[in-house]
């Protein structure tokens, strides 16, 4: 696949229906809908067809469903695959399949369940020449962009300590670290 294909809309496919409970409910399946020059064509999700999936397809604009990711990649021949699951242990297999086919990736965070898997994913992207983006939208929030500008300009001095905080309630702990921690750490190094 080459980056110079601009004569047609970019084809985007979705891996996993994130409208399912415990799959994120982040709306990542709708991230590309309505963007100019983009066509969302299909969702691959192994679960049974449900009203929830039908709604996710309607929201995303996808018109086809596949039970298997590799079949979807081969049939749809997408430019970009969106890995929608927030479960990092589900990312590596579809990323391997996409990289083998030269499909660019937009992946829900956290990228991987282990450092070894993250290194493998980075190596796959580099070796195949694909672009890999991890979903960290908080860095584009106006408040954080202004904070970054103030820090970089020296207007508020040099930060000495940065403290990250999650929900600070019963939902905290390891789950909070996985769900919010990557955003907090991303903002700290942004």
Give, region by region, the residue ranges found by the protein language model.
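Beta-loop-alpha module in the N-terminal Rossmann-like domain of NAD(P)-dependent dehydrogenases
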Residues: 61-124
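N-terminal Rossmann-like dinucleotide-binding module
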Residues: 1-60
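Acidic-histidine catalytic/liganding microenvironments
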Residues: 35, 75, 141
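A contiguous active-site-proximal alpha/beta segment in oxidoreductase catalytic domains
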Residues: 112-174, 182-184
